[in-house]
Amino acid sequence: MSRRHAAEKRVILPDMKYNSILLSRFINNIMKKGKKALAEKIVYSAFNKIEKKHRVDPYQTFNNAMHNVKPHLEVTSVRVGGANYQVPTHVDERRGYALASRWIINAASKRSEKMMIDKLAEELFEASNNRGVAIKKKEDTHKMAEANKAFSHFSPKKMQ
């Protein structure tokens, strides 16, 4: 590891349609091989599908989904005296949203619908209603942290 100062956080421009940095990050996570226009088309088409099918505000649905899937605790592996312990730690907001978007995208891609637009639309709608595979992933992460609560005194970061 380098001993120099930590790399600066890059400034991400908000997306054109909703002027949201969170949505812009989500689009960047959807993107493969630098095809940002295709990623934007997938996300905005999924938003249109949510609006037509469920008659709700798609941007509000997206925000609810991200908020519902965002974890508050996770486990990190800490080596103490030759043994590895899974220590529960708090997740900061930026990492929480990064995990949430990754989990939603992975859950959507594993769905049975034919097109990614349909998969993403359904997963976002389910996550906004506290259902779906992404929500289960969050609950499993919290259960793991709760099960390893006894090792929280090994925490590398102070738990608040």
UniProtKB/Swiss-Prot annotation:
InterPro entries attached to this UniProt entry: Ribosomal_uS7, Ribosomal_uS7_bac/org-type, Ribosomal_uS7_CS, Ribosomal_uS7_dom, Ribosomal_uS7_dom_sf
One Pfam short name: Ribosomal_S7
Protein name: Small ribosomal subunit protein uS7
Assembly notes: Part of the 30S ribosomal subunit. Contacts proteins S9 and S11.
Reported function: One of the primary rRNA binding proteins, it binds directly to 16S rRNA where it nucleates assembly of the head domain of the 30S subunit. Is located at the subunit interface close to the decoding center, probably blocks exit of the E-site tRNA.
Keywords: Ribonucleoprotein, Ribosomal protein, RNA-binding, rRNA-binding, tRNA-binding
Cross-referenced Gene3D superfamilies: Ribosomal protein S7 domain
Gene Ontology terms for molecular function: rRNA binding; structural constituent of ribosome; tRNA binding
Gene: rpsG
Gene Ontology CC annotations of this record: small ribosomal subunit
Gene Ontology process terms (BP): translation
HAMAP family given in the database record: Ribosomal_uS7_B
Organism from which the protein derives: Rickettsia akari (strain Hartford)
Family note: Belongs to the universal ribosomal protein uS7 family.
